[in-house]
């Protein structure tokens, strides 16, 4: 194929996978070597493929985002020559209210592949894309598909942000930035599309956070190419000159800007450079070398990659290397790759493995993301019955609030053992020293000479946190409370726990000093803790170097006492700007706003059966088939009593519930302005296995009385439709962006899955459609686990299944046990086992053959089998001692416990096609069959393994 055909093919693959893929995933779809693929992507240029890289402790991840210069014409009637596409964007997205038969009434063309459009696509080398793939590409490339941008938006940090009545329903972002032509180095308008308010508007218009993230990365790439690093030192008389430290829009919490702090000398000697803002970027000399990171993709020679980072580390002296260095918004050295600045869930690392500490700018308003207050909530249903229930859970993804990270104005430095510890810029140390008494400032000390200060929110009662940082499991550094046996309740009794689940610790530097707000238990006194007083690490900590943190509260005196491991654990809680209004917590550690990436969105079915045996399971383990969470920066937090929310959500009549003063909107999936999400088990149509814990979804349409009627059910004034919820759910999973035509009585309808709208083809009447699950309580879950009232129906045996499931008395088997079923010697199954057994052991007689029946293991086997691409089943024998029989029948084989040295057909286990054929010792030996759950009992003189 020629290059244009290859470019179109790569674009088609990317768009079929949502417009973005990692390089490894792309290589799995294309039969090309890595070096050749790199040359193709480089030849296509950033106007076709945006190349990104993110790094963490596991290494550097390279991603490819598809983009195009093709645009949709915005004119309703275009009479002049135009090189843009002429089509209806709502029809492309499946949301146009004009049906296919009435498309001539629409002012825009519904013929996506018209002769004129096909020529435009051919000019842009996109002629091989279908309508769905073209929609994915245009949505993330053409600003025309974004919601309307506020024309009176003046920028951040002003008294009047825009002239529209508040709250403004339009986007508050820089329009020039979305078009790729913003040339202001310090633009007053926001360039952050992942801002929570902007993201909420995007979601209302059908753009998911993943799509918005792709748009953000594409715009960042354009902005970086238009404003290269060489242009980032503006003239003093120009806008954004040296007399301005930075614009107010850059003071905000901006996920797309990088502020690189060079690491100090490993020896940690010498104070930081006093001149922070005047230091030259140590990476400036090697900015061009960043483009070479992808050049050696697929090669074994990494020396040149290492030289890039080593040059950055050695080009300056130790004093300069400690200084805070700064890039502009979206800044990164010129090159083939733009770093994914919005994704701060992983730390930026160089190709040689040295961490690049990303300091993200903070906005005072955006910083104060808090959790809705109140320990109890009022759930209001359609009957206005109020029931007070606990609001938020006392744990967040299994990590306690006392172990939440506390970050303030801390930087990072490299230590001898490779850990990252927090330091302050010298400018900030001086500014704090001028406003505080040295005896009332908490300090963090270590073996080096650098000292970090935390400033209390209450000037008269400063906090004394003694903490240290360590590398977290996801590659981020955090300051943790390290007192063992951490209490399970928060200081104020709300039972809220919080933790960072990913992302780099925020590093704040600048002219203004930011403060860490630390709250202690009522009645506690604050105590200074010296860094040398190291305590045993917390069980959740991954580092061995920790310090305990004690905190102060208003109105309490501070005492200078050392904290011992036996003292009361310190409780850390981040306060809102108005503590009287919000008594719960928020965390100042910014992480990636790609909130869909935090946590795993599918709940593990095996875990619900209490039988997940995978060490690194890629699914969410939870005790319910659903999980409601609230996103409060930087983590998802569980609601405490999820059954109340789930029960309301399952009722299609309920769109909004009020929990005290907080509003949960199921349509927008928000709690006030905070995003919420619902994790779930797979849909019942996704698995051929009829598992009792899959989610059953029901589909409803709203009539003229605003009442919801389930599809397939009759109503007093409407005829039942020919389709039901099961049919819609199956069609929805096979074509989630499609349009389904059906009829009910004499009326014909179209249902758009993307817009969730039902349209009457004749009258053009539109009805709202909702999809809600069937409510399952915790008692229902326990009952399904226990059985025997509910036993899942076994699938029909197919060509690849060696044996069908046995008939058994289900009442005699509990969900956690097994049963032996003796096979009749006239059964076909008995004959197959006997024939294979006697093929190598003719001199022995089979007394009985028993089959092991374990419902849990059988369901697990069937689910795994459905995911296999090459389904090859083998009938194997395995010899094991009687001592292990009960464990294996209950829990299946464990190669660590029951394995041996010979590995032939299974990891650590001796599997054989034929049975053993010689004897040396006498005994009675059983041979369980792992995959099918059967046992052959032999009365023999012993068996010897080859």
Curated annotation (Swiss-Prot):
The modification Phosphoserine is found at residues 257, 262, 265, 269, 273, 324, 350, 425, 553, 583, 680. GO terms for biological process: cellular response to exogenous dsRNA; defense response to virus; innate immune response; negative regulation of viral genome replication; positive regulation of canonical NF-kappaB signal transduction; positive regulation of mRNA catabolic process; positive regulation of RIG-I signaling pathway; positive regulation of type I interferon production. One of its GO terms (molecular function) is NAD+ poly-ADP-ribosyltransferase activity. The modification Phosphothreonine is found at residue 277. It is found in: Cytoplasm; Nucleus. Antiviral protein which inhibits the replication of viruses by recruiting the cellular RNA degradation machineries to degrade the viral mRNAs. Binds to a ZAP-responsive element (ZRE) present in the target viral mRNA, recruits cellular poly(A)-specific ribonuclease PARN to remove the poly(A) tail, and the 3'-5' exoribonuclease complex exosome to degrade the RNA body from the 3'-end. It also recruits the decapping complex DCP1-DCP2 through RNA helicase p72 (DDX17) to remove the cap structure of the viral mRNA to initiate its degradation from the 5'-end. The N-terminal domain is sufficient to bind to viral RNAs and promote their degradation. The second and fourth zinc fingers are involved in binding to specific viral RNAs. Contains a divergent PARP homology ADP-ribosyltransferase domain which lacks the structural requirements for NAD[+] binding. It is therefore inactive. This is Zinc finger CCCH-type antiviral protein 1.
């Amino acid at each position: 194929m020629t290059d244009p055909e290859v470019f179109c093919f790569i674009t088609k693959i990317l768009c079929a996978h949502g417009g973005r893929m990692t390089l490894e995933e792309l290589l799995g779809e294309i039969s090309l070597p890595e070096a050749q693929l790199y040359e193709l992507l480089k030849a296509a240029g950033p106007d076709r493929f945006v190349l990104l890289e993110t790094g963490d402790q596991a290494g550097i991840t390279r991603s490819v985002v598809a983009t195009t210069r093709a645009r949709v014409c915005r004119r309703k009637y275009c009479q002049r020559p135009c090189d843009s596409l002429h089509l209806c964007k709502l029809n492309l997205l499946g949301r146009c209210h004009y049906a296919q038969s009435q498309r001539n009434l629409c002012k825009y063309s519904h013929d996506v592949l018209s002769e004129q459009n096909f020529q435009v696509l051919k000019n842009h080398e996109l002629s091989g894309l279908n309508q769905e793939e073209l929609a994915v590409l245009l949505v993330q490339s053409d600003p025309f598909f974004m919601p309307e941008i506020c024309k009176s938006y003046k920028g951040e940090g002003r008294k009047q942000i825009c002239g529209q009545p508040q709250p403004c329903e339009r986007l508050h972002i820089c329009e020039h930035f979305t078009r790729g032509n913003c040339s202001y180095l310090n633009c007053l308008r926001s360039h952050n599309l992942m801002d929570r308010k902007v993201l909420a508007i995007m979601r209302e218009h059908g753009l998911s956070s993943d799509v918005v993230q792709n748009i953000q990365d594409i715009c960042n790439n354009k902005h970086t190419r238009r404003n290269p690093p060489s242009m980032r030192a503006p003239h003093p008389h120009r806008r954004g000159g040296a007399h301005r430290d930075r614009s107010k829009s850059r003071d905000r919490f901006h996920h797309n800007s990088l502020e690189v702090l060079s690491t100090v000398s490993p020896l940690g000697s010498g104070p930081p450079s006093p001149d922070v803002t005047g230091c030259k970027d140590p990476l400036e000399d090697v900015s061009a070398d960043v483009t070479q990171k992808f050049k050696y993709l697929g090669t074994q020679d990494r020396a040149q990659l290492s030289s890039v980072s080593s040059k950055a580390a050695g080009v300056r002296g130790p004093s300069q290397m400690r200084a805070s260095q700064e890039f502009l918004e979206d800044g990164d050295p010129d090159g083939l790759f733009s770093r994914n600045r919005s994704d701060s869930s992983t730390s930026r690392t160089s190709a040689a493995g040295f961490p690049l500490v990303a300091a993200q700018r903070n906005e005072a308003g955006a910083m104060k993301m808090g959790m809705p207050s109140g320990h109890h909530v009022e759930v209001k249903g359609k009957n206005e019955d109020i029931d007070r229930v606990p609001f938020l859970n006392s744990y967040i993804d299994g990590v306690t609030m006392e172990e939440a990270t506390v970050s303030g104005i801390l930087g990072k430095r490299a230590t001898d053992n490779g850990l990252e510890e927090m330091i302050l810029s010298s400018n900030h140390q001086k500014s704090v020293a001028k406003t505080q008494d040295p005896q009332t400032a908490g300090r963090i000390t270590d073996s080096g000479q650098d000292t970090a200060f935390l400033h209390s929110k209450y000037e008269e009662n400063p906090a004394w946190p003694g903490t240290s940082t360590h590398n977290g499991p996801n590659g981020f550094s955090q300051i943790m409370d390290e007192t063992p046996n951490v209490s399970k309740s928060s200081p104020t009794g709300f039972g809220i726990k919080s933790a960072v689940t990913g992302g780099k610790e925020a590093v704040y530097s600048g002219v203004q000093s930011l403060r860490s707000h630390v709250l202690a238990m009522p009645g506690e006194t604050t105590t200074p803790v010296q860094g040398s007083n190291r305590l045993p690490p917390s069980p959740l900590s991954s580092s061995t170097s920790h310090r305990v943190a004690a905190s102060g509260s208003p109105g309490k005196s501070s005492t200078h006492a050392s904290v011992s491991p036996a003292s009361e654990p310190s409780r850390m809680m981040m306060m809102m700007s108005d503590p009287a209004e919000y008594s719960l917590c928020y965390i100042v550690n910014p992480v990636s706003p790609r909130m869909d990436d935090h946590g795993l969105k599918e709940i593990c079915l095996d875990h619900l059966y209490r039988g997940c045996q995978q060490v690194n399971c890629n699914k969410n383990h939870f005790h319910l088939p659903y999980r409601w969470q609230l996103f409060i920066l930087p983590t998802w937090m569980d609601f405490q009593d999820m059954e109340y929310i789930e029960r309301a959500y399952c009722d299609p009549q309920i769109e909004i519930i009020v929990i005290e003063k907080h509003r949960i909107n199921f349509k927008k999936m928000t709690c006030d302005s905070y995003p919420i999400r619902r994790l779930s088990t797979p849909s019942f149509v996704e698995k051929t296995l009829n598992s009792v814990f899959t989610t059953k979804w029901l589909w409803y349409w709203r009539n003229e009385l605003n009442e919801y009627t389930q599809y397939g059910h009759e109503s007093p004034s409407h005829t039942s439709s020919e389709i039901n919820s099961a049919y819609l759910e199956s069609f929805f999973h096979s074509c989630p962006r499609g349009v389904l035509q059906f009829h009910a009585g004499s009326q014909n309808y179209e249902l758009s899955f993307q817009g969730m709208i039902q349209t009457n083809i004749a009258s053009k009447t539109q009805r709202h459609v909702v999809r809600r699950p069937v409510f399952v309580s915790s008692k229902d879950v326990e009952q399904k686990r226990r059985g025997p009232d509910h036993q899942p129906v076994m699938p029909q045996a197919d060509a690849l299944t060696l044996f069908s499931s046995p008939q058994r008395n289900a009442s005699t088997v509990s969900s956690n046990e097994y049963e032996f079923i003796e096979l009749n010697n006239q059964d076909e199954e008995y004959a197959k086992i006997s024939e294979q057994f006697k093929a190598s052991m003719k001199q022995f007689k089979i007394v009985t053959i028993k089959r092991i029946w374990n419902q849990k293991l059988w369901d697990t086997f069937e689910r795994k089998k459905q995911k296999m691409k090459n389904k090859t089943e083998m009938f194997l024998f395995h010899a094991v001692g009687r001592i292990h029989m009960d464990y294996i029948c209950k829990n299946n084989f464990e190669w660590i416990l029951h394995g041996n040295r010979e590995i032939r057909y299974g990891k650590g286990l001796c599997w054989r096609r034929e049975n053993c054929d010689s004897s040396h010792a006498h005994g009675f030996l059983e041979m369980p069959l792992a995959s099918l759950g059967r046992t052959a009992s032999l009365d023999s003189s012993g068996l010897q393994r080859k």
